C-alpha cells in the first residue's frame, strides 16, 4: 500500500527568521468543509499566527483562511480560531514548555497528508536583533562559497 506524498499548502518563512525553532510537532486541525476547499486552493495567510493553550486545548489564532468563492450562504468565518488535535500528554508537555520564559507556539507550515490537513507546530524562542544579523551574515557567506565553487567548477 503506497502512501501519498505530502502536499505543502503554505510555509511560514517569517517564523524561521524571527524565531529559533526548538522542537517541531505534527498535529491535526479542526476545520469546516469550505475551509478545506479553500486550503486546497492555497488561500491561506498566517505570518503573525500563534497557538495558545486554553483549558487543555490548543488553539491557533491570528491567521486567515479566505472564504471559498464557490460557496453561497454556508461559508465560514475567515478569522475564527481553529482547534488543534493533539494527545493529552503532548498538550501537557507543550504547556510546561510554553510556561518557560520566552517560548511560544508558532505554526510553521500547513500541508495535506493522505488527504488530511496537518499543521507543523514549532516550539520557538524569539531571536534578538543580533541573532538575526548573525544568521544573515552566515547565509551570505554560504552563498559566496557556493558561488566560488560553481565558478571554479567551470
Swiss-Prot record:
User: What SUPFAM superfamilies does the record point to?
Assistant: Small protein B (SmpB)
What subcellular compartments does it reside in?
Cytoplasm
Q: Which CDD domains match?
A: SmpB
Cited InterPro entries: SmpB, SsrA-bd_prot, SsrA-bd_prot_CS
Q: Which GO terms describe its biological process?
A: trans-translation
Principal location class: cytoplasm
User: What keywords is this UniProt entry annotated with?
Assistant: Cytoplasm, RNA-binding
RNA-binding as a keyword of this entry, yes or no, is: yes
Acyltransferase among keywords: no
Could you say which residues form the signal peptide?
none
Give a Pfam family name. SmpB
Entry GO MF terms: RNA binding
Q: Which Gene3D superfamilies does the UniProt entry name for this protein? A: 2.40.280.10
Name a single GO cellular component. cytosol
Give the protein's biological function: Required for rescue of stalled ribosomes mediated by trans-translation. Binds to transfer-messenger RNA (tmRNA), required for stable association of tmRNA with ribosomes. tmRNA and SmpB together mimic tRNA shape, replacing the anticodon stem-loop with SmpB. tmRNA is encoded by the ssrA gene; the 2 termini fold to resemble tRNA(Ala) and it encodes a 'tag peptide', a short internal open reading frame. During trans-translation Ala-aminoacylated tmRNA acts like a tRNA, entering the A-site of stalled ribosomes, displacing the stalled mRNA.
Instruction: Say which family it is in.
Output: Belongs to the SmpB family.
Q: What is this protein called?
A: SsrA-binding protein
**Upper lineage ranks?**
Bacteria, Pseudomonadati, Spirochaetota, Spirochaetia, Spirochaetales
Gene responsible for this protein: smpB
Amino acid at each position: 500500500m503506497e502512501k501519498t506524498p505530502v502536499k505543502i499548502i503554505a510555509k511560514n518563512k517569517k517564523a524561521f527568521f524571527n524565531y529559533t525553532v526548538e522542537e517541531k510537532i505534527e498535529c491535526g486541525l479542526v476545520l469546516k468543509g469550505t475551509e478545506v476547499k479553500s486550503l486546497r486552493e492555497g488561500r491561506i495567510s498566517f505570518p503573525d499566527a500563534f497557538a495558545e493553550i486554553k483549558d487543555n486545548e490548543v488553539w491557533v489564532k491570528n491567521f486567515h483562511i479566505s472564504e471559498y468563492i464557490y460557496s453561497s450562504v454556508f461559508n465560514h468565518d475567515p478569522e475564527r480560531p481553529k482547534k488543534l488535535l493533539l494527545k493529552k500528554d503532548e498538550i501537557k508537555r507543550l504547556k510546561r514548555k510554553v510556561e518557560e520564559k520566552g517560548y511560544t507556539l508558532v505554526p510553521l507550515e500547513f500541508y495535506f497528508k493522505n488527504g488530511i490537513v496537518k499543521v507543523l507546530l514549532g516550539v520557538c524562542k524569539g531571536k534578538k536583533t543580533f541573532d538575526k544579523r548573525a544568521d544573515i551574515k552566515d547565509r551570505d557567506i554560504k552563498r559566496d562559497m557556493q558561488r566560488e565553487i560553481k565558478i571554479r567548477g567551470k
